[in-house]
């Protein structure tokens, strides 16, 4: 649930996405590399018109640098998602940033990010690495499989 009065709820186009990435980068001056994935990355590649938030993945140290600079500009919460994946969510003035930490997030997906050909955008101290479409689809496929397995567990069925 989004705090009242914070956020516009959706990132409606690539220009808005770039402005939001620039905002994050303007607050973090220390050299930091993060992977942009999920909806925002699909939007970057022109495969999605609107996305609800910006998802990034990085090391614990890089997440700490980002959180220490952004927490004063918005409300932060810790979230437990599908398969007990923990991540941080920061509600900023006009958008929501979700941070998945390499050491907490599932390693296979992070290895896919590390092996991917990536576009890169640098704003302030942050370089946003945007994986190729094939890698994004492979990660999305794994997320769908995890959702399916969770559904099967809820129904009491065996996962394969």
Which ranges hold each PLM region?
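Helical scaffold of the NTase/Pol beta-like nucleotidyltransferase catalytic core
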Residues: 1-36, 62, 154-159
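Short secondary-structure boundary/capping segments
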Residues: 26, 46-48, 89, 113, ...
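Conserved catalytic core of two-metal-ion nucleotidyltransferases
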Residues: 74-108
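Catalytic cores of NTP-dependent nucleotidyl/adenyl transfer enzymes across multiple folds
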Residues: 107-160
